UniProtKB/Swiss-Prot annotation:
Family as reported in the entry's similarity comment: Belongs to the EF-Ts family.
Name of the protein in its database record: Elongation factor Ts
Signal sequence range: none
GO CC list: cytoplasm
Amino acid sequence: MADVSAKIVKDLRDKTGAGMMDCKKALAESDGDMVKASEWLRQKGIASAEKKSSRIAAEGAIGTYIHTGARVGVLLELNCETDFVARGDLFQGLLKDVAMQVAACPNVEYVSTEEIPVDVVEKEKSIEMGRDDLSGKPEQIKAKIVEGRIGKRLKELVLLEQPFIRDSSMTVAELVKQVAGKIGENIKVRRFTRYTLGEGIEVDQTDFATEVASMKTA
């Protein structure tokens, strides 16, 4: 695998409009060949998706997913630029896939890392800084370890950072980019709500023998 310099990554980004990490991955997959890397990005639908990511996506649809057994349900809003695209099979398929992803990820609370409140980040930082295995380490090293741990923990809370359940080689964010590139419009996951049957309801735990005994004395 060829070494990928920062300059060639920047050149590919300028040429395609794709993100830095996507460009780096494309070049690594293409042994540093700019032409092949550009083709790789187009095949993945990433190049064109990045160029459209700043456009306003105010149309779309709200989709639902009810898991087998009807114990988990999801409402999810997915936005695009036009009503025509929102009705199309590609968009509707993405809507279903992302809603299904939410159903499969009970720990996910936010769409993107930017949505995570500062107080949540600070709380995680405080917890990690107090770990026994960090005592006695230099502050600089401790801070670096904590940063890595927090980053990993926060990713677990973010929908777009999750490996796609149908293809774990890509994240949900990469899936959205791929479909956006194929469709030719900006696509955004706006919000979601996940429901679990009986969640939050306190149930009195009475064993069967006790219940029968109480019925006899009634």
